[in-house]
């Protein structure tokens, strides 16, 4: 079961053991991916034994020793779909946390060789990004984050305990280049929550990831709350 503790334990991992997932592991994770694909309506696929997708030339951000990934397949037009990006972040983070619960390590990867993925990509479609999945050489490490005060604001009389707990989870959400370009506001009714983020680049995917973490913690705290705008 995905909990706030799952969020705390999960860290990005870039170095893996170089081994493919065992068949039972792959099938179990594949069932989770298929379930979330059905619920979300997104094109999500688990792809095994495909290390070539991580072969890129870059000075940083490389994934080593990973053979399995989750691919997000979207419409192939040049125009970026904001709604799809936000959903990719939200549902992708659900997969990341479910994988953590199952004993896997993960890393969000915008930097990859998309054309080398063995995902099934129909004409007119493309891979938006992937998530590396496997057994890491380490469990990853905590990264530096912005303060909760920087990432949030409160318009009601006082901050509530559930909001503080949810903001801690949001603070731990992985974002591109660790930029954390978002702000979450508890509105004056002490129930409605607004999230603001730039609508460019990978920021909208990041917004979806943050939403997922915040939602898990707020619901675990038993809060009576709602988003100002649903996905």
Regions found by a protein language model. Name each.
Residues 1-231:
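Acidic, surface-exposed loops and disordered segments
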């Amino acid at each position: 079961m995905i909990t706030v503790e799952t969020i705390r334990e999960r860290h990005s991992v870039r170095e893996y053991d170089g081994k493919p997932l065992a068949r039972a592991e792959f099938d179990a994770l594949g069932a989770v991916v298929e379930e979330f694909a059905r619920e979300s309506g997104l094109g999500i696929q688990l792809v095994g034994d495909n290390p070539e997708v991580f072969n890129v030339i870059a000075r940083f951000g490389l994934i080593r020793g990973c053979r399995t990934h989750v691919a997000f397949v979207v419409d192939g037009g040049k125009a970026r779909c904001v709604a799809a990006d936000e959903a990719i972040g939200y549902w992708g983070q659900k997969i990341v946390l479910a994988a953590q619960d199952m004993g896997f390590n993960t890393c969000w990867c915008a930097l990859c060789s998309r054309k080398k993925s063995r995902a099934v990509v129909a004409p007119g479609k493309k891979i938006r990004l992937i998530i590396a999945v496997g057994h890491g050489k380490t469990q990853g490490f905590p990264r530096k984050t912005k303060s909760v005060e920087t990432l949030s604001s409160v318009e009601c009389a006082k901050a509530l305990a559930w909001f503080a707990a949810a903001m801690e989870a949001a603070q731990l959400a992985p974002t591109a280049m660790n930029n954390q370009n978002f702000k979450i506001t508890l509105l004056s009714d002490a129930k409605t929550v607004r999230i603001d983020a730039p609508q460019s680049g990978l920021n909208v995917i990041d917004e979806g990831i943050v939403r997922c973490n915040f939602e898990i913690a707020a619901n675990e705290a038993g809060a009576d709350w709602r988003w100002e705008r649903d996905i």
